[in-house]
Regions:
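C-terminal and late-domain segments of enzyme folds
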Residues: 70-116
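Cysteine-nucleophile active-site neighborhood
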Residues: 1-83
């Protein structure tokens, strides 16, 4: 987030969205689209909370255990099925997760904003 803000990308991303553009965040990019990233153990940098971009109503807390799984997945809006790998660190929760981007091995993952 620090580098993204230092380069002015936060301003560009928000302007793109205001003009009707869509933003897709994968992995850490998804976490940065939320309100807050809490890293109490300094796993990804300085210990503490970092303000996200606020494009998704979600908050993330980082945990030291990294998850790596092969998954069977489905994109709920289109019912498109796919397979892949999930590399995951931390837990992201919030109201926008009620509109998941995907279902991985039958559980919801990711979020789609109210405005799509």
């Amino acid at each position: 987030m620090t580098y993204l803000r230092a380069q002015g990308w936060d301003i560009d991303l928000k302007a793109h969205r205001r003009r009707g553009g869509h933003v897709l965040g994968i992995c850490g990019g998804y976490q940065m689209l939320g309100n807050v990233i809490d890293d109490p153990e300094g796993i990804e940098g300085v210990i503490g909370k970092t303000e996200g971009l606020g494009m998704l109503n979600v908050n993330t807390i980082m945990y030291p255990k990294k998850q790596l799984d092969q998954v069977n997945a489905m994109h709920p809006p289109t019912q498109q099925k796919f397979t892949g790998y999930e590399i995951h660190i931390g837990q992201t929760e919030g109201a926008d997760t009620l509109r998941p981007f995907a279902q991985l091995n039958g559980r919801n993952e990711g979020a789609i904003s109210v405005d799509g």
